[in-house]
């Protein structure tokens, strides 16, 4: 099926599917959250007065997952199976925290497990800083710890900004669009599909989070942690760019560019 579609059609259809799934499941997920008392209750630090469903992350995750599974060619990107497994693990950690409010230590341990699956299983880590701070090629002894700390830190940074309506999802969409356009023009189509799918999956949540009244939902840790993880994957892949590429794909000091793109959460 995928072999019959051009890369452009795969990209368009993956985004359309993620958008449609997110839009159509938002109401059932909202009702399920109310029924199961899966809500964020107001406290002294809350800006909302009533109980708001904490299930927006479920909408984003399911929409992205369906798009990712149906349109990405895993045979061309073997590391994607570990990206998917890591994202699922971190999503489940977030769901568990949203429901039971686990300790920060346990939550971070779960995040670390998801990141380790990606690094160890997928061999996915930094190998070159492209002149950032005058460093170029780095050994795995440096690249693996740097990737590990960077991913765990970014996951929690994204989670921390998920306190204002539309901020986390809005920033994530901007970052995804930047990375997605770059991946597309540089020929990294599978990563462009990941960026496009996540952007489209975030749109329905962004609208109901920012403009919803009776159907308002929060993203919750399940969504924020998973989005942070996927943004980290995009950032690492961006940093692993071939420094000899020309035109729009040529990136000097790629980690510095990543810091600029992710400036607000970081």
Regions found by a protein language model. Name each.
Residues 2-5, 30-61, 95-113, 135-139, ...:
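Interhelical loop and helix-boundary elements at the membrane-water interface
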Residues 39-49, 67-77, 126-136, 152-161, ...:
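Short juxtamembrane and helix-loop transition motifs at transmembrane-helix boundaries
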Residues 45-47, 87-89, 145-146, 151-153, ...:
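Short hydrophobic "helix-edge" motifs at membrane interfaces and signal-peptide entry regions
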Residues 53-69, 116-121:
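A generic, lipid-embedded transmembrane alpha helix
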Residues 128-140, 245-250:
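Interhelical loops and loop-helix junctions of multi-pass membrane transporters/channels
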Residues 137-147, 252-256:
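Membrane-interfacial loop-to-helix junctions in multi-pass transporters
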């Amino acid at each position: 099926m995928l072999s019959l579609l051009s890369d452009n059609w795969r990209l368009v259809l993956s985004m359309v599917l993620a958008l449609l799934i997110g839009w159509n499941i938002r109401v059932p997920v909202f009702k399920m959250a109310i029924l199961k008392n899966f809500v964020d209750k107001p406290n002294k630090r809350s800006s909302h007065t009533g109980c708001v469903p904490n299930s927006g992350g479920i909408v984003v995750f399911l929409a992205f997952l369906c798009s990712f599974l149906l349109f990405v060619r895993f045979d061309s990107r073997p590391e994607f199976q570990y990206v998917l497994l890591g994202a699922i693990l971190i999503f489940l950690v977030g769901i568990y925290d949203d429901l039971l409010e686990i300790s920060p230590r346990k939550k971070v341990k779960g995040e670390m497990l998801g990141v380790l699956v990606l690094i160890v299983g997928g061999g996915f880590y930094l190998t070159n800083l492209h002149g950032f701070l005058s460093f170029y090629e780095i050994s795995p002894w440096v690249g693996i710890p740097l990737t590990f700390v960077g991913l765990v830190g970014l996951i929690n940074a994204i989670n921390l900004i998920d306190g204002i309506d539309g901020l986390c999802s809005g920033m994530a969409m901007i970052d995804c669009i930047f990375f997605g356009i770059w991946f597309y023009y540089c020929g990294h189509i599978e990563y462009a599909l990941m960026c496009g799918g996540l952007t489209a999956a975030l749109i329905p949540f962004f609208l109901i989070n920012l403009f919803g009244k009776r159907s308002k939902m929060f993203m919750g840790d399940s969504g924020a942690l998973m989005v942070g993880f996927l943004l980290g994957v995009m950032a690492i892949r961006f940093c692993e760019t071939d420094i000899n590429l020309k035109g729009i794909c040529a990136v000097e000091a790629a980690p510095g560019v990543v810091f600029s793109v992710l400036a607000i959460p970081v």
